Amino acid sequence: MSASSSSALPPLVPALYRWKSTGSSGRQVQRRCVGAEAIVGLEEKNRRALYDLYIATSLRNIAPASTLLTLQNLKEMFELALLDARFEHPECACTVSWDDEVPAIITYESPESNESARDWARGCIHVQPTAKSALDLWSEMEEGRAAANDNTPSKSIELFLLSDVSTDSTPIPQDATVEILFHSNHLFWDGIGCRKFVGDLFRLVGSYIGRSDSREMKKIQWGQEIKNLSPPVVDSLKLDINTLGSEFDDKCTEYTSALVANYKSRGMKFQPGLALPRCVIHKLSADESIAIVKAVKTRLGPGFTISHLTQAAIVLALLDHLKPNDLSDDEVFISPTSVDGRRWLREDIASNFYAMCQTAAVVRIENLKSIAVSHKDEKELQVRALESACRNIKKSYRQWLENPFLQALGLRVHNFEASYLHAKPIPFEGEANPLFISDGINERFIPHEIKQTATGENVLSVESIDFVVNQSLPYLAIRLDSWRDASTLNIIYNDANYTEAEVQKYLQSIVEFMLAFRL
């Protein structure tokens, strides 16, 4: 499969991706996946959870002494909050199926009664009295799935509540930790939608804290929530895709050509195979993060961000790792990347759009030979190389993000990519470029505290947030986000392809280049 012309890219036909009522009850709707959904919904991979999302949160009990928290009553409170959230965002209860087409089918079925809805919520929330962390549980779950050869698609959302107590009815001491692992099937959400939903749950659960009737659920008019499903993204764009012409076709071809070229480009050498998803994490302190941001603004200007610097550091660390002696004067780094597509949706839809909404851009850094530096070089030489790379990166994003049709482009090229990966599940040949995604500031979606709604008192403090995605393709996926002014870098990888020591060393190199940029 090639991307030599726009003829390789079938046109977008909105009617193919709209919700349709199925069955005679009027309680079930379905639609076909489109765009990035089609990639993460590929049957072989989705059945094995190979793109699943996890958000690991660590909370501290800061409730007043009069508020008793146990794993069991937290479970009951989160069940009720989940029911409220389901009414507003039914994506959390969607399911997946497949037929003879590449894109999967998403189905939503409204519960028949409040009792069946409560049974669904009970099955989504689990508790464990344990000293394990949420990330420990992630590893354990993936190891168990692999050992059992489980091919059951993951639910749209599940919660696992953990605390180091004797039983699920043991009071959780003040200042003790409650870890919550949110597990999502990526088909139904992107990272932003998932974070928004977690934030909603943290706000909604406050309504049930301290209530004597917290086990009682309110009556919900099930069936009415179907109208709250995120509308088809193809019908939510600011523009009419039927008006798109040759400029759109040319840009689609430019992206798919870059995508295919990326599969064959210079990158990290990997061992073939598929084993378990793993993650290494580096948390910069708030002081380090603030100093880096200040340096970026001072050296480069107010339009630059820590994300530009991180992408630059990733490329410098790659060159330092490879130490190529055959770089030509005109060799470039090209990497497709993922971008939040909500800015291209209509304003009345964008802020409340929880389903997958990712589009595509291409980062291009010119003249790699001029930025091939090492940590042993003078700081000023490293800084100049980082500045040069940052300017190339910002220019790349500007050239792509200024296109009014970029979300439509993402839908079309990701449809192509899904078919490409369906035909060739491992498109890389011995080497793979790292992929960078900036997730931004978590406070945009998730509150610092869970409050008791009736009193306004803080009950649980959200101390940390870690976001991981199961990795199956043999590249290193590097993510950046922040919480309470402190930035976190993590690398997600598959341990068939790389050793933990290799990945740790590469992550440390990225961090060192970023820290070298400080004033």
Swiss-Prot record:
Family annotation (InterPro entries): CAT-like_dom_sf (IPR023213), Tri3/Sat12/Sat16/Mac1 (IPR009992)
Q: Deletion: any effect?
A: Leads to the accumulation of deacetylated calonectrins.
The EC number on file is: 2.3.2.-
Q: What class of enzyme is it?
A: transferase
Q: Which GO terms describe its molecular function?
A: acetyltransferase activity
The record's Gene Ontology biological-process terms are:
mycotoxin biosynthetic process
Q: What name appears for this protein in its UniProt entry?
A: Trichothecene 15-O-acetyltransferase TRI3
Looking up PANTHER family in the UniProt record yields: CHROMOSOME 7, WHOLE GENOME SHOTGUN SEQUENCE-RELATED, CONDENSATION DOMAIN-CONTAINING PROTEIN
Whether S-adenosyl-L-methionine counts among this entry's keywords is no
Instruction: Give the induction annotation.
Output: Expression is positively regulated by the trichothecene cluster-specific transcription activator TRI10.
Q: Is Endoplasmic reticulum a UniProt keyword of this protein? A: no
Where does the chain bind 15-deacetylcalonectrin? 414
State the Pfam families in the record: Tri3
Misc. comment: Trichothecenes are sesquiterpenoid toxins that act by inhibiting protein biosynthesis.
Q: In which pathway does it act?
A: Sesquiterpene biosynthesis; trichothecene biosynthesis
Described function: 15-O-acetyltransferase; part of the core gene cluster that mediates the biosynthesis of trichothecenes, a very large family of chemically related bicyclic sesquiterpene compounds acting as mycotoxins, including T2-toxin. The biosynthesis of trichothecenes begins with the cyclization of farnesyl diphosphate to trichodiene and is catalyzed by the trichodiene synthase TRI5. Trichodiene undergoes a series of oxygenations catalyzed by the cytochrome P450 monooxygenase TRI4.
User: Which top-level group of life is the source organism from?
Assistant: Eukaryota
State the organism named in the record: Fusarium sporotrichioides
Q: Which family does it belong to?
A: Belongs to the trichothecene O-acetyltransferase family.
Q: Which UniProt keywords apply?
A: Transferase
